[in-house]
Swiss-Prot record:
Cofactor list: a divalent metal cation
Primary enzyme class: transferase
Gene3D superfamilies recorded: Probable inorganic polyphosphate/atp-NAD kinase, domain 1, Probable inorganic polyphosphate/atp-NAD kinase, domain 2
Known role: Involved in the regulation of the intracellular balance of NAD and NADP, and is a key enzyme in the biosynthesis of NADP. Catalyzes specifically the phosphorylation on 2'-hydroxyl of the adenosine moiety of NAD to yield NADP.
Active-site residue numbers: D72 (proton acceptor)
Residue ranges that the Swiss-Prot or TrEMBL entry lists as coiled coil: none
Gene Ontology MF: a single term: ATP binding
Name of this protein: NAD kinase
Alphabetical keyword list: ATP-binding, Cytoplasm, Kinase, NAD, NADP, Nucleotide-binding, Transferase
Residues that, per the record, bind NAD(+): D72, G73, N146, E147, H157, R174, D176, T187, A188, Y189, S190, L191, S192
Reaction catalyzed: NAD(+) + ATP = ADP + NADP(+) + H(+)
SUPFAM superfamilies cross-referenced by the UniProt entry: NAD kinase/diacylglycerol kinase-like
Family affiliation: Belongs to the NAD kinase family.
Length: 292
């Protein structure tokens, strides 16, 4: 049987016993099948001195498949880097929910074996690009797979800002913040804040206010081509933040403008054959099964 992939990168959560165990099994299993295996440097030492230790960028350059062992947080961290490369990404779930990690940690061999033989489905997920502008100059930027969140930082309190869609004024807002989410992120922070679930194939963004001081403000879904602009009131007394996937923080000052748009980068997710998004939702969210 011909191989669908040849060079494979292993990524995982450092200093986590469950992840360490699965990574060692994966490395041995893949090496015995003559795959060229690279291991992210943060976890390479835990597997042994004989492994090929590389960073995430090198995995993107050298490999045609990356296997992420951990939870969705680990997948998000890897995805923000790997999305710029032509590499497939699949996850082994060692976290809690695992919306993005399909393979079971203790019995991954059968499903992964079929994937490596070419029995898989490919799904492309777009990312967000967030920029902070100050006095007409971009001060910082980063990407997000799930969401970009404008918020006050460590202490929750109400902030004031204006929201523009494609330079058209939508409304002013007094709230604890604003979540701008992709369909991928619609089952994460956005869902907890009352946002709708968007199926991954939708080219759309959802804006979810956080605890707005009004009874009429609701989440709104806009086209993914839209450019979202959040203008922070100069009267806000404290420095704010834009959080990308909860991992990367961009500092924001009163009067700054935050631009959020769809990134040109797309994550190429690999799923086992027969993957069903609604089956994942039922399992993870406790929905009822079929009645007949």
């Amino acid at each position: 049987m011909s191989k669908a992939f040849h060079s494979i990168g292993l990524i995982g959560k450092p200093h986590h016993s469950g992840t360490h165990k699965t990574l060692k099994r994966l490395h041995h299993w893949l090496t015995m099948q003559s795959y060229d295996v690279y291991v992210e440097e943060r976890v390479a030492a835990e597997i042994g001195p004989q492994v090929k230790s590389v960073d995430l960028l090198q995995i993107g350059e050298y490999c045609d498949l990356a296997i992420v062992v951990g939870g969705d947080g680990n997948m998000l961290g890897a995805a923000r880097v790997l999305a710029r490369f032509d590499i497939g990404v699949i996850g082994v779930n060692r976290g809690n929910l695992g919306f993005l990690t399909d393979l079971p940690p203790d019995t991954f061999e059968e499903a992964l074996g079929k994937v490596l033989q070419g029995e898989y489905e490919t799904e492309h997920r777009f990312l967000l690009e967030s920029e902070v502008h100050r006095h007409g100059e971009m001060k910082s930027s980063n990407t997000a797979v799930n969401e970009a969140v404008l918020h006050p930082g460590k202490i929750a309190h109400m902030i004031e800002f204006e929201v523009y869609i494609d330079d058209k004024f939508m409304y002013s807002q007094r709230a604890d913040g604003m979540i701008v989410s992709t369909p991928t992120g619609s089952t994460a922070y956005s869902l907890s804040a009352g946002g709708a679930i968007l199926t991954p194939n939708l080219e759309a963004l959802i804006l979810v206010p956080m605890f707005p001081h009004t009874l009429s403000c609701r989440p709104i879904v806009v086209d993914a081509c839209s450019i979202i602009k959040l203008v922070v009131s100069p009267d806000n007394g404290d420095a704010l933040e834009v959080s990308c996937d909860g991992h990367v923080t961009l500092p924001v000052l009163p009067g700054d403008e935050i631009i959020v748009r769809r990134s040109k980068e797309r994550l190429r997710l690999i799923h086992p054959k027969g993957y069903n998004y609604f089956h994942v939702l039922r399992n993870k969210l406790g929905w009822g099964s079929k009645l007949f």
